[in-house]
């Protein structure tokens, strides 16, 4: 048997799995879109271009969006016992305009960014296998920083990929 006979062509990547998470889990969720104040009829391309950006250090200006989520991947530096197994951190930076921070609930006691973080946790952790990815909750915290009128809340998950 030749070496080429043992090779199986890769037809799906881990990146494809994350795109499926956005397409099939995050974007269709009405409650999350309501918390993010996304206008009715916004298509998925505008959603990922304007409201749910995948970029570690975006240069997109926050203009009239009341809520924006910027997500990024970071490879884990410590080993997992095999070169073929890689750990990743998926981090979400949730920016919420101060004008709408306390308007998510009727009693105005809950912060919108915390409710969005809870919803993302629910969506990614409710099933063991979320579009072929298994997420573990890692950490969440208020950054206590402002971006000219916006509050920032950070949410981090951990997942593993194989070669």
Feature-to-residue mapping (PLM):
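Hydrophobic, well-ordered secondary-structure segments
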Residues: 14-15, 110, 114
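Hydrophobic beta-strand residues in large extracellular and virion-surface proteins
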Residues: 22, 26, 69, 92-94, ...
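Short histidine-centered catalytic/ligand-binding loop motif
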Residues: 99-112
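Oligomerization/assembly interface segments of phage tail-like spikes and tubes
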Residues: 83-102, 148-163
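Acidic-leaning, charged glycine-interspersed low-complexity segments
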Residues: 33-35, 39, 64-65, 112-163
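Small/polar-rich, solvent-exposed N-terminal microdomains that initiate assembly or binding
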Residues: 1-82
